[in-house]
Amino acid sequence: MKTFRIILITALAVLSNLSANQSEIVTATLILEAGGEHAEGAMQAVHEVILNRAVKRRLTAKQVCLQRKQFSCWNSGKIATLLAKAKRHPRWHEALVIVHSAPTNYTGGADHYHADYCDPYWASSLQKTRKIGRHIFYK
């Protein structure tokens, strides 16, 4: 519990420094990665991963989202096109609220996840924390 409190405090600091553009990129990441998921906590869980990585790697939330090969939704590199697509998604405002709300702890501190139909090489070296919808989370 103590670790979660430390991460929460640091994550709140990350959130308080979000510019409008950073907020849009993080919100778009939630939509593009989990907007089609209707499992409770799916978008919050992706948000947790972003914040946990930002804290752990000392990066901005936007830098975490746009890191090469980290979130498959951005792999094409067509940021403007993908951002416009995400903004048209019916759950855009829901995702925006998540981005500007206090972090949750659905994933138990996860900083990695993958879809349940994949078997990435790195999964066996991490501790599985939870499955939410079609995503499996690890730390």
What does each of the following model-derived ranges do?
Residues N21-K139:
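Bacterial extracytoplasmic/cell-wall-associated proteins, especially those involved in peptidoglycan
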Residues K2-I9:
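Sec-dependent signal peptide recognition
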